[in-house]
A protein has these predicted regions:
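Short coil/loop residues immediately preceding or within conserved phosphate-binding loops
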Residues: 6, 12, 26, 43-45
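Short coil/turn motifs at secondary-structure junctions
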Residues: 14-16, 34-38, 53, 77-79, ...
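Short aromatic-glycine-enriched beta-strand elements
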Residues: 18-33, 87
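Residues on conserved beta-strands of the protein kinase catalytic domain
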Residues: 25, 42-44, 85-89
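Beta-rich strand-turn-strand
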Residues: 51-86, 102
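OB-fold and OB-like beta-barrel modules that bind single-stranded nucleic acids
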Residues: 5-13, 31, 64-75, 93-96
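Acidic, gly/ser/pro-rich intrinsically disordered tails
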Residues: 1-3, 17-22, 39-41, 84, ...
């Protein structure tokens, strides 16, 4: 069976590296994936789980708002809490491409004469 998905979105929060009791590093993040249908925007919030080196790089190089492309597989878990049933879908990342950084509100001073610097 084939279980493959590719998701593009922005990180909802800054990734936080965690370690399992067995010593394996992981990061659990959510990405915001925007869709447009009939001129209406809708945002899906997709949970992503990354392990080991992939998790370490994600936490090291990415911040909230960073656009990433996640290539992985879907993991579906069904849970019951009280009398309600829940289905949780998570993308288990196999590869993550770090794309454009978050939109910055920083402004930079314009240098009119570069010779003044040297």
């Amino acid at each position: 069976m084939i279980n493959r998905t590719i998701m593009l979105g922005r990180l909802v929060s800054t990734p936080e590296l965690k370690i399992t009791q067995a010593g394996t590093s992981y990061v659990r993040v959510t990405i915001a994936n925007e869709q447009v249908y009939k001129d209406k925007k809708h945002t899906n919030f997709i949970d992503v789980l990354a392990w080991s080196g992939l998790a370490e790089n994600l936490s090291k190089y990415c911040d909230k708002g960073r656009k990433i492309l996640v290539d992985g597989r879907l993991e579906v878990k069904k849970n019951t809490k009280g009398d309600k049933n829940y289905t949780n879908v998570t993308v288990i990342a196999e590869n993550i491409d770090f794309l454009e950084a978050a939109k910055s509100s920083q402004t930079f001073e314009v240098i009119e004469n570069a010779e003044d610097i040297f």
